[in-house]
Amino acid sequence: RIGARKGYTAVSTNNSNLGTSRGVEALHESLDRSGDKVVFSGGNNKIFSGTALTDITPVGYTISANNWKIVDFNDHTYFFQRGHEPLLYTDHSGSGVLEAMSSHSHATGTPPQGNEVLAAFGRLWVADVTGNKHTVYWSDTLNGHAWTGGTTGSLDLTNVFPSGHDEIVALSAHNNFLVIFCKRSIIIYTGATSPANMTLHDT
């Protein structure tokens, strides 16, 4: 059943931070281990927290769009967007910090600057990178900021696409399957808990 409601109620209390932009274009609610809730939003080429729209954009970090895909994984919050170095939010010290992944003390390797990210099967999965829309990348086990060594890896789907060239647009996990949505096809892998051994299930 589809319903519609008239009007809207403003939640943010500091809309001046959005300037004359299109407003909030990305929104994500995060819940940490302590049960604390943080609402992240992206707009006006900035990243905000809370309804007061507190600007938490890392100093010196340049944002050119607000198409963030935001996921929670292992008590961290990750921000991905094509053409941007991924961002990482942690609250281990009791004071939340948003930083470029390369600035994080435990980060390793170079993460893909993908437009799609999925937290599933004990790791992060990323796809839709500028110049490469046919490869899925994955992080190390239980470590979304480790992109070299360990069980990190990637999968080139060039020879898997069932109807010629295609482009990955979204990733999902369902019934223990890794589902890869492309513009012209859907590709399903089984055994994604061990990516090095996962096999093609269906296209």
Predicted regions and their residues:
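Recognizes the extracellular SEMA beta-propeller fold with strongest preference
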Residues: R1-T203
